[in-house]
Amino acid sequence: MEVMNLIEQPIKVTEWQQTYTYDSGIHSGANTCVPSVSSKGLMEEDEACGRQYTLKKTTTYTQAVPQSQGDLEYQMSTTARAKRVREAMCPGVTGEDSSLLLATQVEGQTTNLQRLAEPSQLLKSAIVHLINYQDDAELATRALPELTKLLNDEDPVVVTKAAMIVNQLSKKEASRRALMGSPQLVAAVVRTMQNTSDLDTARCTTSILHNLSHHREGLLAIFKSGGIPALVRMLSSPVESVLFYAITTLHNLLLYQEGAKMAVRLADGLQKMVPLLNKNNPKFLAITTDCLQLLAYGNQESKLIILANGGPQALVQIMRNYSYEKLLWTTSRVLKVLSVCPSNKPAIVEAGGMQALGKHLTSNSPRLVQNCLWTLRNLSDVATKQEGLESVLKILVNQLSVDDVNVLTCATGTLSNLTCNNSKNKTLVTQNSGVEALIHAILRAGDKDDITEPAVCALRHLTSRHPEAEMAQNSVRLNYGIPAIVKLLNQPNQWPLVKATIGLIRNLALCPANHAPLQEASVIPRLVQLLVKAHQDAQRHVAAGTQQPYTDGVRMEEIVEGCTGALHILARDPMNRMEIFRLNTIPLFVQLLYSSVENIQRVAAGVLCELAQDKEAADAIDAEGASSPLMELLHSRNEGTATYAAAVLFRISEDKNPDYRKRVSVELTNSLFKHDPAAWEAAQSMIPINEPYADDMDATYRPMYSSDVPLDPLEMHMDMDGDYPMDTYSDGLRPPYPAADHMLA
């Protein structure tokens, strides 16, 4: 009956809502005009606390439900209890003369008496707050059952008024704790929010859940009551405040409530969130983007849903059009997570992601710069043909001068990928002192292979196949890089780094001016040592009949090919030829002619071609029985291999009898030179054959994926992001660090 009376008198409900802080009106039913708390005492209390409140008298009505004398006595005792406690503990708060606490006042100054009284005033204020806190909690606890019934009422007006009251209660900590301790009330709020078509009710109910979500108990209550699907539904609301409350509540759930991420995914939350990226409120977008990052991190299906709903394009637009740092940071975190997804990467690049991210590399926000660097690093393997990256490349070269390990790792990796098979980018980096900057980065990196390896790869790209390649080759020498580079051949450096270094040395040897410094750095003995070790390892597997395994992503046959190719170029110098010959390498080179790998046959024939220019070496080649395999190689499908073989045969047959020379000549004519006079001339005159090696094509980083990476701390309840672990290396572009994502710590 009491609830029915409240429904029949909306004006009374309104007045109750306005004055609920002091008397809910549900349990007392007192037919009285007495204020719930003495207005004079409360005003004095407010002055002591330095605060002001709007005071109203509370009138409750009991026309339909007469109240017993016992209920009235209970209400009077409850109302007076707080006042008695205040009077007992803080007489100055409720007395008539509290305003005269300090009569002596010098205008604009604090007297000594006032300063002495400050601690007691602070204590009095704390006690008053404690009493009020207890009052709020008791009030909310008494009101909960009745409020739950009102929220479940069939009359939408009653439901709206009840939602308003609960919303007010949820704004105070004590009453808020009472609310989230009632599963029935939270469930009623969720049910009301899900079923209402009234905008005010939707606003109040989402506000209630938003307030509760600031406590772990509240998050659990929302989660258990099925609040996540209801909140996802509210993301379609046309009311901005409802959208804000819904997205912030979901954000808190995603951050702190176990199981929330899966629940949001199952409720199609991603499909609702991605379109919200078209809103224009930066703070709203910052929370929305962080929700996307939390859902996409470590979950490939979520990344694909974001892609299917146009997420990459919208995120790139945000990076391009906004300047709010927190939004740019959260957006860059989403892009960083998506940048390890093979499907999302091309979409981000095609939307102009490289250029948009590059805009922020000079930002004053270190966390934004680092996220942009990681994302660029991860995208760079699919952006080798992108135009308009001139400013990005210049900034990356400048970034090589910093000492931050993450910055150096990203800058070197990105430069390595963007200079892969891109002559324009190679020339630009070379002309902007990129070679010098990379050498200095290598010198500072020490044993950090994740910096040294991509830096060496970038140098390898810059020293071949573009108009400024010779300039780059000379620049390495002029910046004292050769000794440091040769040292990288030492074990126990990782094989990927060793392989990249071998390729760089081969390119440096193309410049005659580099031969002497390379020799002084003892590069030839180191290359021969690596060649012997790699060949022995490869032969062991051949003898055992097992497949050649990868060591850190590198096959030993690749090391054999690289070392032999570098020695081939170095052997063009007479002093180097003599040193290679004296290291007793000819038996090994002859053995390599029998290799089943075509590229190894070619480089072995090439180095023998150079060595055979010296008679002593030519005799040694002949003595090792090289004629037979060389005759076979005359029929090779690789023209370079056949030409090298012919040149060696001509050289070693010079001292043979005429019959032998004639037989060799006939064989060469029939097999190789019948339709190629130029090759005949080349073989006879020992002109070096300069066809490109297999590794002349720039080798970039291969995809390296690892597990989820740590993320940067988010200051507005956003505590996650992605960082990137170490990856392995091999030839090929280096895509992202993780195949899962990054968490930023």
Curated annotation (Swiss-Prot):
Modification N-acetylmethionine, positions: 1
Annotated glycosylation sites: 14
MF terms in GO: alpha-catenin binding; cadherin binding; nuclear receptor binding; protein phosphatase binding; transcription coactivator activity
GO cellular component: a single term: cytoplasm
Keywords in alphabetical order: Acetylation, Cell adhesion, Cell junction, Cell membrane, Cytoplasm, Cytoskeleton, Glycoprotein, Membrane, Nucleus, Phosphoprotein, Repeat
Annotated ARM repeat ranges: 132-171, 172-215, 216-255, 258-297, 298-341, 342-381, 383-420, 423-464, 470-510, 512-551, 574-613, 615-661
Residues making up the signal peptide according to the UniProt record: none
Residue(s) carrying Phosphoserine: 99, 125, 182, 665, 730
Topological category with respect to the lipid bilayer: Peripheral membrane protein
SMART domains: ARM
Biological processes annotated in GO: canonical Wnt signaling pathway; cell-cell adhesion; positive regulation of transcription by RNA polymerase II
Assigned protein family: Belongs to the beta-catenin family.
Quaternary structure note: Homodimer. Component of an E-cadherin/catenin adhesion complex composed of at least E-cadherin/CDH1 and gamma-catenin/JUP, and possibly alpha-catenin/CTNNA1; the complex is located to adherens junctions. The stable association of CTNNA1 is controversial as CTNNA1 was shown not to bind to F-actin when assembled in the complex. Interacts with MUC1. Interacts with CAV1. Interacts with PTPRJ. Interacts with DSG1. Interacts with DSC1 and DSC2. Interacts with PKP2. Interacts with PKP3 (via N-terminus); the interaction is required for PKP3 localization to desmosome cell-cell junctions.
Domain notes: The entire ARM repeats region mediates binding to CDH1/E-cadherin. The N-terminus and first three ARM repeats are sufficient for binding to DSG1. The N-terminus and first ARM repeat are sufficient for association with CTNNA1. DSC1 association requires both ends of the ARM repeat region.
Protein name: Junction plakoglobin
Organism the protein comes from: Sus scrofa (Pig)
UniProt gene name: Jup
